[in-house]
Design a protein with these regions (language model features):
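Non-catalytic helical/linker scaffolds that mediate oligomerization, partner binding
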Residues: 1-366
């Protein structure tokens, strides 16, 4: 049977909502640590509610944490804002006063930027074209500690960008630099903090983002052991580097994750279906379980019924051999988290029944 994960969030963080999701066929929860922390009371309360729901229904809790890893995200922002096509924006490391809206980005991205580059925001929701590099701004900072120490001067690079399409800029949004691979550390400082708490909170699996090769998985597995964790690693395929080293990733991962959001940015949308099929086929050939994620039921963020293409997508993922399916925003912030799980489970079950019929030679019956 296909294993179904739902992402926990404000739409489903209470025991009643989680019980409904479990009753509708959810097997485990995902916690997206790019938007929360195991150290926060709100996150711990959600885990407590999930455990209570599992205990009440007599099912084993499955808690997956999705690390921040080396992915590139926008910096923290007080308030989101909307960009219209053609609107200009300043791209820089820190959110300081500017005449135009600011997109704060990490050091790794600002160092890689050049005029003409295209920044893709939030799984391709919209993009920003880098027009030109602006005059850098020096900033003097005191190192602290010794009052006699000299100030250190930092030079902040700044770029002018222009919105290509309409979109919302928020803090902690995923950013992809088209045609370039820009990464931070395999395990971020925030990941280290979360991993110190993972065993205590009963984490049962870890999702590793932006895996580039099998060596990345080995590094994370060694790090997990240092925190007293010996749990499965779900390795997300999201880049060209991952595709180039797919064999080593399949060898080292416990589960391969076809993460279609950033993967589509890496290979282009028209190529995504074929890439998904090839990854699935390689995993099946190697007898490696795999998961399919991203926009499985995206319309159900606001609608109580999925679209025909969405249910067909789920069906085909199972036909291709997917062992796991997962939804993200559909359950974490969507209006109908329990219904999302119900449709995901029902369509997956129909696909499994079809496979059984096909094996028995009766699949042509309608």
């Amino acid at each position: 049977m296909v294993t179904v994960y739902g992402t926990i969030g404000k739409a489903c963080c209470n025991q009643e909502a989680l019980e409904n999701m479990l009753q509708n066929g959810m097997n485990g929860i995902r916690i997206n640590l790019s938007h929360t922390s195991l150290a926060l009371d709100s996150c711990r309360d959600s885990i407590t509610a999930y455990r209570a729901a599992c205990e009440h229904l007599g099912v084993k809790p499955e808690i997956m944490i999705d690390l921040q890893g080396p992915e590139i995200r926008s910096g923290n922002m007080r308030n989101p804002y909307i960009l219209e096509p053609g609107d200009e924006i300043i791209i820089r490391q820190r959110q300081r006063h500017e005449e135009k809206p600011i997109l704060p980005v990490p050091t790794a991205l600002i160092h890689a930027l050049e005029s003409g580059d295209r920044i893709i925001v939030h799984d391709g929701e919209f993009s920003i074209r880098v027009i030109e590099e602006l005059e850098a701004i020096p900033e003097e900072l005191h190192p602290g500690g010794d009052e006699n120490a000299e100030f250190i001067t930092f030079i902040h690079r700044r770029f002018l960008g222009r919105a290509e399409g309409r979109g919302r800029i928020r803090g902690r949004e995923t950013l992809t630099l088209e045609g370039k691979e820009v990464y931070g550390n395999v395990i971020s400082s925030a990941d280290q903090t979360n991993l110190t708490l993972a065993a205590e909170l009963g984490v049962t699996s870890v999702m590793q983002p932006f895996v580039r090769s099998g060596e990345d998985i080995i590094a994370v597995r060694e790090a997990l052991a240092g925190y007293g964790l010996t749990c499965p690693i779900f390795a997300k395929i999201e880049s060209k580097s991952a595709l180039d080293h797919l064999d080593s990733i399949i060898e080292q991962a416990d589960v391969v994750v076809i993460a279609r959001g950033d993967l589509a940015n890496a290979v282009s949308l028209p190529k995504l279906p074929a890439v998904q099929k090839r990854i699935a086929a390689k995993c099946k050939q190697a007898n490696r379980p795999f998961m399919v994620v991203t926009q499985m039921l995206h319309s159900m963020l606001t609608n109580s019924v999925p679209t025909r293409p969405e249910v067909t997508d789920i069906f085909n993922a199972v036909l291709d051999g997917a062992d796991y399916l997962m939804v993200t925003g559909e359950t974490s912030v969507g209006r109908y988290p329990a219904e999302v799980i119900r449709y995901l489970r029902e369509v997956a079950s129909e696909a499994e029944a079809f496979l059984a019929e096909n094996a028995a030679g009766t699949a042509c019956k309608v």
